[in-house]
Amino acid sequence: MCPPDHFTVEYAINPWMDITVEVDASLALKQWDMLRTTLADLGHTVHVLDPEPGLPDMVYAANGAFSVDGTVYGAQFRHPQRAAEALAHRGFYTGGGWDFASPVHVNEGEGDFAYLPAAYGGMVLAGYGFRTDPAAHAEAQEVLRRPVLSLKLVDPAFYHLDTALAVLDDRHIAYYPGAFSPASQRVLAQLFPDAVIADRQDAEAFGLNLVSDGRHVVLNTEAVAMGDKVRAAGYLPVHVELTELKRGGGSVKCAVAELRR
């Protein structure tokens, strides 16, 4: 995670960003810290990346890389405003002894990649359409040595995979079908017939932008209906307020890069 010390909305690179609305910086930091504390209280180790001036979106730490079994596929951001974030993330991983692969193609880390270690022998789901170059999917497959399934995003409101699809445990997902092309919807329905299906209201509340450890599902307080759905599926929803981070187009998952070693 990376604290929102420099978080503000000073440019608009997704439909949720409104440069005319001022961010409450102290509230953003308070809410972020509550998310960090919640994850720690659930038994997880939280590493904190130092924020850098001039990079207001570094708080969305999930976008900086994607890791599987000790190997890290680095990010290359679509928009120049975020480009320098990739170097900060690379420094974290290389300094920590991870096997780091620098990308050739544009990709935005866990924003557009998700891993299911027990599904079909270990599968990566990968989104494209708005941020990540489809060629990055093949590149990630070579780096990570896992099959990568490409899914086309078609609604600009859900510009990253992690706004439209969430991993609930090692083999199960939740997703909003309307965010995907008809072909991708059919693929998801075939591969994950027991998925938790979200509706547009769930997705617009960033209810799919969640973090799950296989039992506890951490999601924002606006996603009440999504919390009810994951509870009905056998998980324990844990709600955290993240109203300020939503102003930049992100929520729980955007703020958390999961480390898989």
Residue spans of the language-model regions?
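The feature marks the mature, well-folded catalytic cores of soluble enzymes
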Residues: 1-261
